[in-house]
Amino acid sequence: MLVVTTNDLPGHRVQEVLGEVFGLTVRSRHLGSQIGAGLKSLVGGELRGLTKTLVETRNQAMERLVEQARARGANAVLSFRFDVTEAADVGTEVCAYGTAVVVARE
């Protein structure tokens, strides 16, 4: 599955546009991570626990996007984006989205 942020795929021709696909996940915050992050924010620096959680969350959202695109018969996703939102002060929502297409080499 080719997943790109561009609106086209060099060297390929779009044969069919299958529509929007997305992968969504919401992760709750771990109390220990929140306390550690609060203390770390006082002195500065990377919040490694939160960074790890966000990377895992983004990867899961992307995996779900790819699953949905495959289920619709796509072999590529164009205009791929992430949207990250705080969900009611209890977690983080990550949505990966794009346009599912069938492409062929030119």
UniProtKB/Swiss-Prot annotation:
SUPFAM superfamilies, per database record: YbjQ-like (SSF117782)
Domain of life: Bacteria
Alphabetized InterPro entries for the sequence: UPF0145_dom_sf, UPF0145_YbjQ-like
Pfam family, one: YbjQ_1
Disulphide bonds in the chain: none
Family the UniProt entry places it in: Belongs to the UPF0145 family.
Protein name: UPF0145 protein SCO3412
Source organism (scientific name): Streptomyces coelicolor (strain ATCC BAA-471 / A3(2) / M145)
